[in-house]
Structures are given as structure tokens and as C-alpha cells.
């Protein structure tokens, strides 16, 4: 049982370390508005992951590679990421002072961040695929233990994202990147567009 837990926890954490749309959204928001604002995105991301975990735990296999639901998820995620990336690329720019005040960008509410994080997690087909694959390997494991694994993974997602937000929103980090926020926004926007193109390409390849 301990070996299985270490396998599940290790695979999940390694997947978590891979930077994706959630990571870039959290870092940008924390740099601009502080970790408390970014925590809304963190909670939304954790809830989105929790929904996919719940579906995988329940044994619902509708979201599988090649299925209509998975294809719809791929295209919806691609369009959402492309929209986010384009918004950042066409932004007139944001300046920030070391006290955390910003100019040129509205301060998002906590609830708005939660909705953005939830959408980012739910519209990421890699999340659905990862959890479906992981729970398929646990078919012989007691359901109660699978549920505990699910709770553990949601907690780790939330804890890790909050840690990223706290690090990016630290005063020393903000001071270091205060003069480069426009470049960070452009890089973030370009990265999200590239991810969107990659997801769309996969969707076309799976037709």
C-alpha cells in the first residue's frame, strides 16, 4: 500500500511540476496583484482538478482520447487559451511598483480569479487524460483508498499552487521583475497561444 501511494503521489507531483496554463496565470496574477488575489486562481484550479478526479474515481469514461467529449474539451480549451494569450499580447502594458500597486490593469476580484482558474483547469484536456489514466491503474484498489488518493491530490494541487503564488508575489520577486512586466505578459501570452495551437493540432490528429 505504501509503495502504491508513493507511485501515485510521485507521478502526480511530477505532472504538477510541468508548467502549464495554470502556472503562468498564477505567476502573472501574483506578480501584478499579490498572492492573495492569485489564491483565487489556485482554488479554482484545485476545484477543476477535483472534478476530473471525481469523474475518474466514479469510473466515468466518457472523456477518453478520441471520444466526442474529449474532442469538444480539446477545442474548447484551445479556444480559451488562444483568447487568454491574445488578450495578453494586445494588452497596452502594465506597470507595477514595489508596493504592489499597478497601473494599466484592473485588479481582478478573488471570485473572478476563482472562475478563471476553474476554467483553465476544466478546459485543459491533459488533466482529464492524466486522471483517467491514473485511476485506470488503480482498478483493483479499494474505493475508499482511491478516494483518499483523490483528496490527497487535490490538497497537493492547492498547496503547490499557493506556494507558487506566494513565491511569485514576494516583495523581493516583485522588485526584481517590476521593470519587466510587459515582457512577462508577452511571453505568457505567446506561451498560451503555443499551447492552444498544440492542443488544436492534437485534436485534428485524433480525428
What are the language-model segments listed below?
Residues 2-71, 133-149, 153:
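Juxtamembrane transmembrane-helix termini in multi-pass membrane transport proteins
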Residues 6, 10, 107-119:
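Alpha-helical membrane-protein architecture signal
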Residues 13, 17, 50, 86, ...:
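Hydrophobic/aromatic residues within the transmembrane alpha-helices of Major Facilitator Superfamily
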Residues 22, 48, 52-59, 81-84, ...:
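Alpha-helical transmembrane segments and their lipid-water interface positions
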Residues 35-113, 197:
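Membrane helix-loop-helix hairpins that form the core translocation module of multi-pass transporters
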Residues 66-96, 153, 160-161, 175-207:
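Selective transmembrane alpha-helices of multi-pass membrane proteins
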Residues 78, 120-132, 189-192:
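Core segments of transmembrane alpha-helices
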Residues 169-174:
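Short, flexible, glycine-rich and Lys/Arg-enriched loop motifs at helix boundaries
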Amino acid at each position: 500500500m505504501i509503495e502504491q501511494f508513493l507511485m501515485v503521489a510521485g507521478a502526480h507531483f511530477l505532472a504538477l511540476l510541468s508548467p502549464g496554463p495554470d502556472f503562468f496565470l498564477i505567476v502573472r496574477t501574483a506578480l501584478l496583484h499579490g498572492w492573495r488575489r492569485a489564491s483565487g486562481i489556485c482554488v479554482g484550479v484545485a476545484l477543476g482538478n477535483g472534478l476530473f478526479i471525481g469523474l475518474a474515481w466514479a469510473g466515468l469514461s466518457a472523456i477518453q482520447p478520441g471520444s466526442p467529449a474529449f474532442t469538444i474539451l480539446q477545442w474548447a480549451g484551445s479556444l480559451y487559451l488562444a483568447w487568454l494569450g491574445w488578450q495578453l499580447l494586445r494588452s497596452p502594458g502594465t506597470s507595477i511598483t514595489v508596493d504592489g500597486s499597478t497601473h494599466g490593469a484592473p485588479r481582478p476580484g478573488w471570485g473572478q480569479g476563482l472562475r478563471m482558474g476553474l476554467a483553465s483547469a476544466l478546459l485543459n484536456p491533459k488533466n482529464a487524460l492524466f486522471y483517467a489514466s491514473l485511476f485506470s491503474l488503480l482498478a483493483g484498489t479499494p474505493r475508499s483508498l482511491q478516494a483518499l488518493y483523490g483528496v490527497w491530490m487535490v490538497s497537493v494541487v492547492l498547496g503547490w499552487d499557493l506556494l507558487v503564488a506566494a513565491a511569485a508575489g514576494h516583495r523581493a520577486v516583485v522588485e526584481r521583475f517590476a521593470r519587466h512586466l510587459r515582457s512577462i505578459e508577452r511571453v505568457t501570452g505567446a506561451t498560451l497561444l503555443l499551447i492552444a495551437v498544440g492542443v488544436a493540432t492534437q485534436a485534428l490528429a485524433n480525428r
